[in-house]
Amino acid sequence: MFKCGGVEVQYRNFGNTGIKVSALGFGTMRLPMFPNSNTIDQEKSIELIRYAIDNGVNYIDTAYSYQDGQAEIVTGKALKNGYRSKVYLASKAPVWEYNNEYDFDRILAEQMRRMNVNQIDFYMLHSLDANFWDNKVLKYNVLEHLYKAKRDGRIRYIGFSFNDDFDMFKWICDYWEHWDFCQIHLNYIDEEYQAGLRGLEYAKKKGMAVNIMEPLRSGYLANVPKSTQIVFDEICAKPVEIAMQYLWDKEGVSCVLSDMGSFEHINQNLEYAKVSSIGMLSGKRIMAIKKAQQTYINSRMIHCNGCYKCNCCPQHVMIPRNLEAINKIGIHNSVKIAKEFYDGSVALVGGSATDCTNCKWCESICPQHINISHWMHKLPELIK
């Protein structure tokens, strides 16, 4: 337990590694950017990362692909001046970039140069699904290279992040005996989605640590519809508080990752993390979550989790924000809210759905297999 300014961060077992990590981890997928720009505000981002570390967060999660590679660079800078020794550093290998057996070592070396480190504590194969598993991991003997990197000290622990169904998750877990941990998409809306609760339980039984990504479902669970907010108000709880506690309540969860873009966001999550514990949910809160689940099930239009893997459109369509605009129609039961979001976050800065040429490149890499081109052409009609 770490205390700073009255804040106490709880630590949890990281599978069978013997390591304890903070219940709250700092994700770098959405570091703050300059207005109307794709460039990270490095000074602000470094301040945020170091502030979280100073207040007890000891798990920093980044990836080769986050924010076009900028996230790893900024993370490395944030860990200078003694901060590297205070944290466990996690990053991910972009398996989709592998085209031969040499690419693993080349890309890992590039990542280590970006972050200016000689070792990565937790290294994951990023976004595994059946396609990447067969056509990248197995085809190019990636597991052999991964284990060699562990043996020679470039990485300490081996894992994977996941974007497919439970059967594929189980297959990957069972295929290789050297997995130390995994990272899955889980929140109170998506209990049966991808690996889901079954995946959490299965990994726990195998002694693997389990990190959670998308605890707030890309912000959807932070800005709940009025009907859900009323339910939470009745038990004097905030939406983010409920979403995080839902996960910390579960024994198999090692660390809940949050992309924190402001000091306010960090402080809020720290306050929730300091009271986190297994089995913490009361009966009233469990019932409130069940009601919230039903509300979302009845209102969603597209099962997009905002992973941003499609945000490299050849026509520069800002696909995630366009999809978010569509989902706001159902979640908030309001075309007005959806149009205001679209006008302010898409039309104003460029990347409109109307620029879609139906090339379907985005659909080939979407982990959720969304018919994106269909929705891009439908969006203007939905919000007019």
Where are these predicted regions, by residue range?
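N-terminal binding-site loop/beta-alpha segment at the start of enzyme catalytic domains
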Residues: 2-87, 145, 151
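A general structural detector for well-ordered alpha-helical segments in enzyme core domains, enriched
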Residues: 10, 44-48, 71-78, 107-111, ...
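Conserved, mostly hydrophobic/aromatic
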Residues: 14, 26, 45, 52, ...
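A short, flexible beta-alpha/helix-coil linker loop
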Residues: 29-34, 96, 128-131
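Structured C-terminal cap/extension of enzyme domains
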Residues: 53, 58, 77, 174-175, ...
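Short catalytic-loop micro-motif centered on adjacent basic/acidic residues
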Residues: 59-65, 156-160, 183-184, 255-257
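A short, structured active-site edge motif that brings together acidic residues
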Residues: 85-97, 123-126
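Glycine/proline-rich, positively charged
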Residues: 98-216, 224-227, 234-235, 249
